């Protein structure tokens, strides 16, 4: 609350930078990886979702190193964060369906040649028999890329949450949700490595039908 009060003049990407600076979280991205982000034109960024809210902030920051016309598709519960709301396109992750208004916002942003960040898993990585993994990715971003002929840019965030959080996901969804915000503050004074892959042109892999 004290942080919000002393930085109420900041909005959008300026607030993202200030939050990361306040938490002393350094997003480490190589210059070579940043070159994969085009300076102009529509782009869909797809990434794993290892930690929670921090993932979105980190990718907004990463893209903003090259261009500032970026938004992230995020859980509707975060839309109340007014200083960041201009960067969000809210969806109902719990309901499993995307409202028409949100789909229109996504299409408009891409048609205006902006960058749109997706976390296709729809929720934070969970323990599985193969280790900590995202859930099966929702294919909505592929349909959007195909429809509008927008290239994809894969990103991998190299991070994880605490053992306590992972244990809570096996016991109670409510408890794990309460612990989720705590996970971001747990990462104070640390680095967050981000690896950016090569662009995938829409017509290389996907059909528009």
Predicted regions and their residues:
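Hydrophobic beta-strand scaffold residues
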Residues: 27, 70-72, 116, 152
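Gly/Ser/Thr-rich loops at beta-strand to alpha-helix junctions
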Residues: 49-53, 124-125
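Conserved nucleotide-cofactor-binding alpha/beta core module
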Residues: 64, 68-111
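Generic beta-sheet signal
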Residues: 73-75, 91, 119, 147, ...
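A structural motif
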Residues: 109-123
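A cross-family acyltransferase "interaction/gating" segment
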Residues: 115, 128-206
